[in-house]
Amino acid sequence: VNQTLLRSAPYFPVHDVERSVEFYDRVLGFRCEYSAGTPLQFAICSRDGLAIMLRRVSPTAVIVPNEKQGGTWEAFFWVNDVLGLHSEFTAAGAVIVYGPLIQESYQMKEFAVRDCDGHVLGFGQALTVAS
């Protein structure tokens, strides 16, 4: 038996799927690969083979990002150039929550951004001797 998991995607409740798709495209470089509904009710946006699912919910009071519950991120992405990605996102107008900083306890250089619905995404690179 050799079943293989192929992909995974966090599922974010959002107020306005069209606005969120535009944000993920313009600010974070995630392209919409699938959408459904008129007006948009659901979308999948991806970058480098990694996806995020966006689903319209109403009322917006049901959107409670992890940060508001005492957590940190809704999703975390390991990357190969955290400083380059931070520069890209900053130039595109991303709201930086923290970083880039070094997390000695788990050996990562990381930063986080907040999307237009308050969801926080972390991006990190494993530390090496050269980092």
What are these regions (language model features)?
Residues 20-25, 89, 115-118:
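Conserved active-site tyrosine of GNAT-family acetyltransferases
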Residues 14-19:
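Short acidic-aromatic low-complexity motifs
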Residues 1-11, 31-80, 84-114, 124-131:
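Vicinal oxygen chelate
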